[in-house]
Amino acid sequence: MSESLKNSQQFGNVYKNGKSFANKYLVMYVCKNELSINRLGISVSKKVGNSVVRHRISRLIRESYRLNDSISNSGLDIVIVARAGSKGKNYSEISSALMHLAKLHKIISSSEPDRN
């Protein structure tokens, strides 16, 4: 189960105190929170494309996270920033990039299969 990060103060806290890893499509920041659930924030800047493109990438990231949510640790604030390279990519590429970053952050174990 997870919720969303709601305001810029919550995002700023994750950027400031969290640890980040990146690949060519996404950057993931992770910071512990005081809750028993994960909170997810997604950021897609105007550099990536117009609103249609940005919203599509946001939906792909959210869906990939949702389908793999049951295998993740709890009590984390996670911010995922889409890079310009993510423009035009399909679900499997975004999901694979997200799972790669989750393994680097040790949110999921590397023995768990991708669910895409």
From Swiss-Prot:
This is Ribonuclease P protein component. Keywords: Endonuclease, Hydrolase, Nuclease, RNA-binding, tRNA processing. GO terms for molecular function: 3'-tRNA processing endoribonuclease activity; ribonuclease P activity; tRNA binding. It catalyses: Endonucleolytic cleavage of RNA, removing 5'-extranucleotides from tRNA precursor. Gene3D superfamilies: 3.30.230.10. RNaseP catalyzes the removal of the 5'-leader sequence from pre-tRNA to produce the mature 5'-terminus. It can also cleave other RNA substrates such as 4.5S RNA. The protein component plays an auxiliary but essential role in vivo by binding to the 5'-leader sequence and broadening the substrate specificity of the ribozyme. GO terms for biological process: tRNA 5'-leader removal. Consists of a catalytic RNA component (M1 or rnpB) and a protein subunit.
